[in-house]
Amino acid sequence: MSIALQVALVMVTILVILLIIGAPIGVAIGLSSAVSMICMIPANVSFATSAQRIFAGSNSFSLIAIPFFILAGNIMNNGGIATRLVNCAKVIAGRMPGALAQSNVVANMLFGAISGSGAAAAAAMGSTIGPLEEKEGYDKNYSVAVNVASAPVGMLIPPSNTMIVYSSIAGSVSIAALFMAGYIPGILWGGAVMILAGIMAKKRGYQAEERVTFKIAMKTFWQAIPSLLLIVIVIGGILVGVFTATEGSAIAVVYATVLSLIYKSFKLKDIPRIVLESAKTTGIITFMIGLSSIMSWAMAFTEIPDMIATAILGLTDNKILILLLINVLLLIVGTFMDVTPAILIFTPILLPICTAFGMSPIQFGILLCFNLSIGTITPPVGTILFTGCRVGGVTIESVIKYMLPYFAIIFVALLLVTYIPAISMFLPKILGLV
């Protein structure tokens, strides 16, 4: 057994043990990487290299967009924007069977597109639409299942922090192209949930709402336009080259702050609290990115990506089977690991395999985010699942059986994204981004 393989086994073993005993993911990544580096090079060189890699890994202009988008999302979550989006969604989906559940899905897509956070969308919609559904006699488990199943769409529809993290790790992958690539898969996910929610609503006898007048519909849309305009300004500005994703994220913060103050949904004294919440989240993400940079260097040094690629390619050279194996691996990883560290760890390992089979790094990025987004709604560490159940006042055990049909239809959507490149690549190509 080569020294590189021995070191790789040490690193993986320490990482797995630390995760099993409940160590924070950042600590597990950093400690396992540091030990493996000490095994390869002298301690003084190892410590110096680790410090340099932490700084280099987090010293990226594109990563500055993450704290700004997090702050913008938190401002909007506290700024009364959710209510206006819910009203808009009710007009769009009000005539469908199970109107409130359908409105929940549409509102999650809209709110997720603005905030970029699936957990924030689940919390906002659960506290806004949930009480309305209960008043109309909807089963609470059914309502929570629809909310949880549709909330991760916000991680695919831009702006998406997960795509920014992937772009920083993957290298020369355009953030604008990734943003555009996420639209159709995100809408596909949301549409699949709406179809199933409608079928189940019909069986349960949940009716459509009364038709609203044209005047009320226009008034509702008009009230939602300022919130939705944020998407147009940020994504449109990035696409036409007026500003970068980082500059667009700063504009999003200013716009969200001004809009929330105009709505009088919060006061200036609330801003320090919101900034502190955003800083905590940003600190966690940046910490993991820096430490994951050490792991990426250690994996490259020990040739772990090459060994894994050789092992997978040794099983079969069939592209369909290899992509299926990668999906299964990512689904398992997403069940036990949060999205950001999973992207940081597995992008250097799996991206070379997929590109070797002719898959675009953009399509792989969407495939990666899609798989790991499913992990956010599966136990034992599904953040969106926990958030939705907590806000909805139900237990995870009771809602899981209602989730099973949604898992099935989301897996079908995943296979379509995997094997039909046009779903991810159509918009980037037509807009000249690739």
Predicted regions and their residues:
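Alpha-helical transmembrane segments of multi-pass membrane transport proteins
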Residues: 1-434
